Amino acid sequence: MKTVIKIIKKDGTLEDYQDQKIINACNLAAQRALVTLNEHDYSTICRRVFEEINEVDYFDEQHQVEAVPVQDMHSIVERVLIELYPTVGEQYIQYRNYKINFVKMLDEVYRKEQEQRYIGDVSNANTDSTMVSTQRSLSYGTLSKELYKNFFLTKDELQATNDGYIYIHDMKDRRDCINCCLFDMSKVLQGGFEMGNVWYNEPKTLDTAFDVIGDITFGASAQQYGGFTIPRVDTILAPYAEKSYKKYVEEYLAVTRSYAGFYKDVAAREYAMEKVRRDFEQGFQGWEYKFNTVGSSRGDYPFIAISFGVGTSTWETMASEMALKVRMAGQGKDGFKKPVLFPKLTFLYDENLHGAGKELEWLFDTALECSSKCMYPDFLSLTGEGYIPSMYKKYGKVISLMGCRASLSPWYERGGMHPADEDDVPVFEGRFNLGAISLHLPMILAKARHESKDFYEVLDYYLEMIRGLHKRTYAFLGEKKASTNPLGFTQGGFLGGTLNPDDKIKSILPPMTMSFGITALNELQQLYNCKSLVEDGEFALEVMQYINEYVNRIKEEDKILYAIYGTPAESLCGLQVEQFRKKYGIIENVSDRAYVSNSFHCHVSEDITTIQKQDLEKRFWDLFNGGKIQYCKYPISYNKDAIKTLVRRAMQLGFYEGINLSLSYCEECGYEQLDMDVCPKCGSTHVTKIERMNGYLGYSRVHGKSRYNKAKMAEFKERKSM
């Protein structure tokens, strides 16, 4: 048995053999693999390594001592780990080569950074890559994404991502923060809160409430990467409207104290009412300017959304009405006004409030008028068929949508995933999503056929891969401290978010969701039997039912709220085509276009009616309860009755319904109409166009340029029913 062993380092110098160095290296690999090794494990590893050293003659004539080259030492440790702890061994091998990988990675980061800086970036329609702040953010994002790919993913996960079988959304952000949320604004405001080491008192007036909510929104949304939704904003603002009303009444009475009588009180109330209405108008105008012109510290324009419509008090209905009227009025110079993009508006539809002849039908009519001019609000059914209406009808709970479409699974106050008893109720506000990973189903089917394997066997492999990624991400984020998002985790913006700054957030993660995304069901059906979702759709339905059964099972096993999400593929719609072609070539109606279809939607080029599209997509509606939207193209903005009939039909079906128009505005003369590239009034080609990207709006053309990628622009040209 050898007793004195030296290690020959890369520079040729000698170093004493030390068990502790082996332990340190193995510990790093174990941490990356999310495996815990104990003292017995380390003792076993060191003993086996020493035994392997003793099997080889390492006597060094020059130094007259047993000396093991460091390269051999690494190989021995690799073999031992692969035999005893394969997962740790894989991570050890990857980490060992990190210097080589790091040089390659930095070279790739530099190349992409130069491309973004001098050519531009259109991967996200909410960013303007011409701005310095955005370029800095993109540079950081490129580095962060490469670090994630090289040091968080396993070899198989990286291969699947590079090939395109799965798509990990927001890789640059996933290790840092959360995705989208329903922010509990009321909880933060009540009693005051701390932000940036400064104490904010609770607002005493409506105009102050608008300002403070704007500050909170910018502060909190910058600490996440997904959509930031303020749910039921009409209810949030109502108490502050009441405070302002009382203040204005007292103000009027103080000025007119020398007068007396009934008419003075009436005049005071009328004065106060008009002042509150003006505060609502200016408040929503302020939000529109702020949310569309001031970039966040992330370098983008935050995806802000608000929902409203079911509040019935004077102040709640006034809030809803003014949000709509301000959007319709537009922003800009006189004669050149056009609607803004943010906040996204969602109208909460209750048949018992907004139905024909009901108390708030007038508010629904106002929302329809607004949508026919601005494409917002989208309409969310609370009383139709399906999951979201069922929660509202049974518990009176509104599930507002996070960002453009994501919805939360139920989480009960006492029982968690399942109600503790008949009196237990679900809670939705204050919860968030921890990230989405999408399956590329056409590629998975093509792989199964290419390798003569059962489709569901291959699908299971990638489902399990996503499951593993979600579990690791869940554990990783749980170690984050509450100080990473103070407004959410310490000031009550999130459910359970009253932690101390140094507390880990793992205790409040159980109510949060993680998503399995789905794209290109139409192309999956085409690859299966050369038929579209309009012509068939049975195989696509079968696959989605299978995935739902799988997700429901592992949700119980892992105690994680997994959800199935209809992916809004932006740049992904083109990337997936490129990935498919690289592996399996160009196949008619599968990969012959520049883009794939979104989620379960019929192909945009289908020449079908609005009713046909609604019925065809209804088949999939209950299989995507983690996020979905249904929209149709309405080239008839002037026909309000037709739009009302079709939206009402969508509400009966339980849809989240969007009205699609192609809004166009001439920058030279201010003329506006649907879908124009050249102004028919003055002949100018300086036209601003607003189109629906997926579940949200963006500029397809502004100042002669687009923030959309080429694949999405190709899709726009073929839109008929979308």
Regions found by a protein language model. Give the residues of each.
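Contiguous, well-ordered alpha-helical segments that form the cores/surfaces of helical PPI scaffolds
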Residues: T235, M514-L527, Q545
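Catalytic-loop motifs flanking and including active-site residues across diverse enzymes
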Residues: Q18, I22, M514-L521, H686
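Long insertion/accessory domains within large nucleic-acid-processing enzymes
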Residues: P680-M722
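A structural signal for well-ordered alpha-helices, especially hydrophobic packing surfaces
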Residues: L81, Y85, V103, H470, ...
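Conserved catalytic cores of very large enzyme subunits
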Residues: F102, V109-P510, K531-L533, G537-R692, ...
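Charged, amphipathic alpha-helical regulatory modules used
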Residues: M1-Q114, V702-K705, K712-M722
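Metallocofactor- and cofactor-centric catalytic cores in central/energy metabolism, strongly enriched
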Residues: E288, L527, Y708-K712
